[in-house]
């Protein structure tokens, strides 16, 4: 495919709302973090809207939490993520902010009028709860595993864009550990979330970076890639990606427990096995 923007993307370029002395402030409030996390924290503090695309296991959640409360000390904050990581978000928030109030929105409706602090909801519940969520003035929005939004035509994507556009949230983080730059079209919805200039028109983006062309039936094909090095430059101020190979300060191995709810019929099958 030619070049790739899947390496270390990010830098000092301001891409919307530079906060003063971001690096120095990041070092001051993050003494217990690994150096790459301090760098990521500084990156998030240096812009109001950004994409953090580190490999899984490099601590995107904690970087986002710290950056969010530093940029906007008063909540509430809304985290949209897959259902399987909602519990992990609560744990990470309480590690960083032991006194934080957290609310998980689950299948049983939660009284949205009482939302404060950190509210965690999964993508699948957005359709049910979006009207209630739009009643709040969120200090920050986090879209975790943001590759769930890679199809800009889905209802999930449209609801997410409504939250960004209609709540007036001053800080937006898009987090993903999945490299999207092998197929640039998957990046477009994330660029919309963070209000990047390249997120204004999909067809213009596709013609420039997706090798867009019409097939024999007159339909646009946008699954290719083109001008990748140029795209890398364009992303430099809005997206930061580090792979584990780039990061030299990690311990050899870390393990963590993740609680999951197992349906009763599955428990019975396991017990009978």
Each model region followed by its residue ranges:
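Conserved pre-motif I regulatory segment
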Residues: 14-53
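Inter-lobe connector of SF1/SF2 helicase motors
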Residues: 237, 241-273
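Conserved Walker A/P-loop ATP-binding site and its immediately adjacent core
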Residues: 74-95, 183-186
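Conserved helix-turn-beta segment of the N-terminal RecA-like "Helicase ATP-binding" lobe
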Residues: 85-108, 194-198
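Conserved helix/coil segment N-terminal to the catalytic DExD/H
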Residues: 109-139
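Conserved P-loop NTPase motor "coupling/switch" region that bridges the ATPase
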Residues: 76, 140, 148, 157-246
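Catalytic acidic motif of RecA-like/P-loop NTPases
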Residues: 57, 124-127, 147-150, 179
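Walker A/P-loop
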Residues: 48-67
């Amino acid at each position: 495919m030619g070049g790739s923007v899947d390496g270390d993307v990010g830098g000092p370029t301001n891409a919307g709302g530079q906060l003063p002395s971001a690096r120095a402030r990041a070092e001051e409030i993050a003494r217990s973090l690994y150096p790459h996390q301090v760098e990521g924290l500084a990156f998030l503090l240096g812009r109001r809207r950004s994409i953090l695309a580190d490999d899984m296991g490099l601590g995107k959640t904690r970087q986002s939490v710290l950056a969010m409360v530093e940029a906007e000390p008063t909540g509430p904050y809304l985290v949209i993520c897959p259902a399987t990581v909602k519990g992990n978000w609560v744990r990470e928030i309480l590690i960083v902010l032991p006194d934080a109030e957290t609310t998980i929105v689950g299948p049983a409706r939660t009284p949205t009028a009482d939302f404060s602090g950190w509210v965690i909801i999964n993508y699948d519940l957005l359709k049910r709860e979006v009207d209630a969520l739009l009643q709040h003035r969120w200090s920050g929005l986090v879209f975790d595993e943001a590759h769930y939004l890679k199809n800009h035509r889905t209802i999930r994507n449209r609801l997410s864009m409504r939250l960004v556009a209609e709540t007036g949230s001053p800080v937006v983080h898009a987090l993903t550990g999945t490299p999207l730059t092998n197929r640039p079209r998957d990046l477009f919805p994330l660029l919309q979330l963070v209000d990047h200039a390249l997120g204004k028109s999909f067809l213009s983006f596709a013609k420039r970076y997706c090798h867009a062309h019409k097939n024999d039936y007159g339909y646009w094909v946008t699954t290719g890639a083109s001008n990748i090095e140029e795209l890398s430059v364009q992303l430099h101020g809005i997206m930061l990606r580090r792979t584990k190979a780039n990061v030299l300060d990690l311990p050899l191995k870390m393990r963590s427990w993740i609680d999951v709810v197992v349906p009763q019929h599955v428990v019975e099958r396991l017990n009978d096995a």
